[in-house]
Regions:
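Rossmann-like dinucleotide-binding domain that binds NAD(P)(H)
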Residues: 151-221, 227, 240-241, 303
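C-terminal capping/lid region of NAD(P)-dependent oxidoreductase domains
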Residues: 112, 317-328
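A contiguous active-site-proximal alpha/beta segment in oxidoreductase catalytic domains
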Residues: 71, 94-156
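Beta-loop-alpha module in the N-terminal Rossmann-like domain of NAD(P)-dependent dehydrogenases
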Residues: 43-106
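C-terminal glycine/acidic-rich active-site capping loop/insertion
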Residues: 119, 232-300, 324-328
Length: 328
C-alpha cells in the first residue's frame, strides 16, 4: 500500500512515522518547502511537493492522510475521495454537517474508505472502559461525564467547544452506543470576545442516559478524564495518569431490607486493570491500513465522524441561543 501524508505541522510527522511502519509513504506534501526538506530527510523514499494535485494525479497512490488546518478538512477530503483515493482525515471531519455530508457522499460514491482520526477511540484504556460497559460489569449505566481542561492554548479562530470537544464527543458516543437527541451548552468568553474559553455541555440520549462535558483552556488543572457511573460499579479513564489509567470502583447504593425503602451506600474494592502500553496512534494507523485492505468500515468512519460534527453543531447552536435545548 502506498500512502501520501499532507500537512507536516504539529501532527502530520507523527502520522508519517506510524504509516511508514505499515505501508510505503510515497509522498509528503506541505505548503512550506522548509518543512518538506526537514521531514523529508526522515523518509528518503518519499517524493515531496507543495501541491496536492501531484498526489491525486499519481495513479499508483492508494491513500492520502490529511493533517491540515481544520477549515480545510472537508474540502481536501472530498477532493481526495473524488480522485478515488482512500482518505484518512484528522478530526473533526468538517466544520458543519453540510460539509460533512458532502465528504461522506464522496466516499460512498467513490467506493473508497473514509476514516476520521478520532484518536482516543483507539486508546486501549477507552476500549477496556467500553468492554466494562458492554459486559454488564458496571450494571446499568446511569450517566457519563468528561473533563478536558488545561491552561491554554488560546485559539483565535475557534472556541473551546470546537477545539477540545471533538475528542470527548467521539468517546462519549462510543461509550453510550447511541446518538443523543438533544443537547444544551453554556459558555463564557473571558480572554477573547465572542470566543468561549470554558464550555459546559449536557447531552440527552433516547435510552434516558445523560452525559456531561466540561471543556476549558482556562483552568489551573490539566485533566483528561472520563467517568462512567453504573448501577453496580463506577469506572474512570484518566489519560493523565501514567500507571493507573483505568480505575474501577465497587461503589454504589444497595436498597436496604427495611420497610422504609432506604438505600445504603456501598464502598467496596477499588481495582486498576492493566492497560496495554501501545501507542493509540499506532493502533489507529494500523486500523486504517487494515480497512483499506479488507474494505471494511472503520470504527471512526465517515458516518461516525459526521455524528460527532452533528453533535458539535447542535451544541454550538445552543451556545448561540442562550443555552436553549438544541435537537441533534
Amino acid at each position: 500500500m502506498r500512502i501520501g501524508v499532507v500537512g507536516l505541522g504539529y501532527w502530520g510527522p507523527n502520522l508519517a512515522r506510524n504509516f511508514s511502519r505499515l505501508a510505503d509513504v510515497a509522498w509528503l506534501c506541505d505548503a512550506s518547502p522548509e518543512r518538506l526538506e526537514r521531514h523529508g530527510a526522515a523518509h528518503p523514499g518519499a517524493r515531496t511537493t507543495t501541491s496536492l494535485d501531484n498526489l491525486l494525479d499519481d495513479g499508483d497512490l492508494d491513500a492520502v492522510a490529511l493533517a491540515t488546518p481544520v477549515l480545510t478538512h472537508a474540502a481536501l477530503a472530498e477532493r481526495v475521495l473524488r480522485a478515488r483515493k482512500h482518505c484518512f482525515v484528522e478530526k473533526p471531519l468538517a466544520q458543519s454537517v453540510e460539509e460533512g455530508e458532502r465528504v461522506v457522499a464522496a466516499a460512498r460514491e467513490s467506493g473508497r474508505v473514509l476514516m476520521v482520526g478520532h484518536l482516543l477511540e483507539y486508546h486501549p484504556g477507552v476500549e477496556m472502559l467500553k468492554q466494562l460497559i458492554d459486559s454488564g460489569e458496571l450494571g446499568d449505566v446511569r450517566y457519563l461525564y468528561s473533563n478536558r481542561l488545561n491552561l491554554g492554548v488560546l485559539r483565535p479562530d475557534e472556541n473551546a467547544l470546537w477545539s477540545l470537544g471533538a475528542h470527548d464527543v467521539s468517546v462519549l458516543l462510543r461509550l453510550a452506543g447511541e446518538e443523543p437527541y438533544e443537547c444544551r451548552a453554556v459558555g463564557e468568553s473571558y480572554m477573547q470576545e465572542g470566543i468561549e474559553d470554558v464550555v459546559f455541555c449536557y447531552l440527552r440520549f433516547p435510552s434516558g442516559l445523560a452525559a456531561h462535558m466540561h471543556l476549558s483552556w482556562l483552568d489551573p488543572h490539566k485533566e483528561r478524564r472520563f467517568t462512567v457511573v453504573g448501577s453496580r460499579k463506577m469506572a474512570t479513564f484518566d489519560d493523565m495518569e501514567l500507571e493507573r489509567k483505568l480505575t474501577v470502583y465497587d461503589k454504589g447504593f444497595d436498597e436496604s431490607f427495611s420497610s422504609y425503602g432506604e438505600y445504603i451506600a456501598r464502598s467496596g474494592d477499588i481495582s486498576s486493570p492493566r492497560v496495554p502500553n501501545e501507542e493509540p496512534l499506532a493502533i489507529e494507523c494500523r486500523h486504517f491500513v487494515e480497512r483499506v485492505q479488507d474494505g471494511g468500515e472503520p470504527r471512526s468512519g465517515g458516518e461516525a465522524g459526521l455524528r460527532v460534527v452533528r453533535v458539535l453543531e447542535a451544541l454550538q447552536r445552543s451556545l448561540q441561543e442562550s443555552s436553549r435545548a438544541a435537537p441533534v
